[in-house]
Amino acid sequence: MSFIKKIFLSSRSSEDGLFFSKLEKILGFKPLNLTHFRRAFTHRSMNKLDEKGNPMNYERLEFMGDAMLGSVIAAHLFNMSPTGDEGYLTKMRSKIVSREHLNELGKDLNLIQFLESKVTLQNFGENIHGNLFEAFVGAIYLDRGFVYCEKFIHKKVIKPYVDIDKLEGKVISYKSLLIEWCQKEKRVFHYDIYEDEDAGKLKYFGVKLSIDGKVVAKARATSKKKAEEIASKRGYFVFQSEIDGK
């Protein structure tokens, strides 16, 4: 074995050892196959392939993690809410696995530290944290199976964050809530969206929310979706007493 190859293998071994230690601290148990976890933090921009020539990135693991989170949380809600009907259980599960919540979980575990990407972090939106969390859960399932994956979800998601009473009052989407109320009360609503630029020439989207022909809220954000949600939240507080039935 050449001297250079020995140095490379030694460096790789040291790198894997550090990665293993950090994973074990987050997981609470030892990972068996680091390849699954390497994949969970590899962005498609790396253009990596596995030994079979298939793309090696976290996108497929996101799918697996999403399925695991959904099934474990569904089972927990089913057992904890014996009187809840299908609609109630579905709504509660949606609140737990909302994109906002998954992003928070990814941030809390600092999974972004493991990301391999040719895209700079500044060019990723908030959802990268939730995407990595889902992929991480998928990697746990492939590495240790359902039982370990279920334990991890209970420890990191359900136990610290799932409070049924608090979740019942949590709003996932102010836009959906406001539209539902407007339709129920036969109110006419309209989102007027327009492009805007700041001094640094960054593109922003402005939104004016009108209800019954009157502008009740305005917002500005880097995406149409964010601007609509912010305007909807402000609109909600204008009509909160009516919407909440107080």
From Swiss-Prot:
Q: Could you tell me the keywords of this UniProt record?
A: Cytoplasm, Endonuclease, Hydrolase, Magnesium, Metal-binding, mRNA processing, Nuclease, RNA-binding, rRNA processing, rRNA-binding, tRNA processing
* Cellular component aspect of the GO annotation: cytoplasm
EC number(s) given by UniProt: 3.1.26.3
What are the positions of the active site?
66, 134
Q: Which cofactor does it need?
A: Mg(2+)
Record-level Gene Ontology MF annotations: double-stranded RNA binding; metal ion binding; ribonuclease III activity; rRNA binding
Per UniProt, Mg(2+) binds at 62, 131, 134
TM region positions:
none
The protein's matches in Pfam families, at most eight in alphabetical order, are given as:
dsrm, Ribonucleas_3_3
Q: Where is the RNase III domain?
A: 20-145
GO biological-process terms attached to the record: mRNA processing; regulation of gene expression; rRNA processing; tRNA processing
Give the top-rank taxon of the lineage listed in the UniProt record for this protein. Bacteria
What is the first-listed, main subcellular location in coarse terms? cytoplasm
Q: Which reaction does it catalyse?
A: Endonucleolytic cleavage to 5'-phosphomonoester
Question: Which HAMAP family does this UniProt record tie to the protein?
Answer: RNase_III
Provide the family line: Belongs to the ribonuclease III family.
This protein is called Ribonuclease 3
